[in-house]
Amino acid sequence: MLINWIHPIDKQDTSKLDLKDKRILLVEDNEINMEVAEFYLNAVHANVDKAWNGLEAVEKVKEQPNKYSLILMDIMMPKMNGDEAAKCIRKIHPSIPIVAMSAQSEYSMNQTIMNDSISKPIDEQKLNHILSKYVA
């Protein structure tokens, strides 16, 4: 499960971020995880495009290389995993921030591919920190 329901959304925290001019590519193969992450991103007014696997993410970036301010990338996905997708995206757009989302506590981020990582379940404050760091 992606969300931490123990801590309700703090309206003051999300009101500090306004990403209405930013487009984020959310890459996640689990529908519930996708919905929860999209909920958090909508709370800060981000424009969200979705991809359900790494191959779809690569195609979206190929179509419009400068469209996205950030990519949030699941690691374990069908067709093409997150690491492979990030490698392909780096060839198209070397400077786009890519943040790994992983439920694996032992995921070791390859810093030449990913800029950062966030563990699942996603914590809203940690996600907002990532958003502030890379796109705000």
Short names for language-model regions:
Residues 1-14, 125, 130-134:
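C-terminal catalytic ATP-binding subdomain
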Residues 74:
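Active-site residues of response regulator receiver
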Residues 35-43:
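Charged docking surfaces used in two-component/phosphorelay signaling
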